[in-house]
Amino acid sequence: MNNEIYLFGNICGDSDVIVDQLIENGQKFDLILTDPPYNINKDFGNNSDCLPLDDFINITNERIKKLKQVLTPTGSIIWFGIHNYICYVQVAMYNAGLFYRRMNIWHYENGFSRSTKEPATHYEPFLWFSNDKKKWVYNCDEVRIPYKSTERLKSPVKYHA
């Protein structure tokens, strides 16, 4: 592995239009990382977060089908969501023919909720799906976090490539 990162760049505009252009141009990506609107009924000025559930599910299905078209054969999609809607995204990924790798959690110390009537959420789930069932890229050494306390390990962990 050459440890190079290729940056496509920031693209501003309607992501649905942009993805259509990428499909037309034959662009392919090894990784798509997306953090789309969560449909949590908040007013961000464009109604993208206030859809009826059926519309949210249909739009999510269409977006994932399009994103699959711009994945390389060994490419992956990482999709951030919110706990009460991520299940619909997961089903859409399966329906698009993608393969489940993991659901992980992004944990943060300070939650986003300003509510005093319920606990703040201190995490966001994200899904990792690949385009191929047996071949995908995952560079574990680059993302591995060392143990904070090695004293609790009875024997060193050995990884085999």
Describe every region a protein language model picked out.
Residues 1-161:
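Core catalytic lobe of class I
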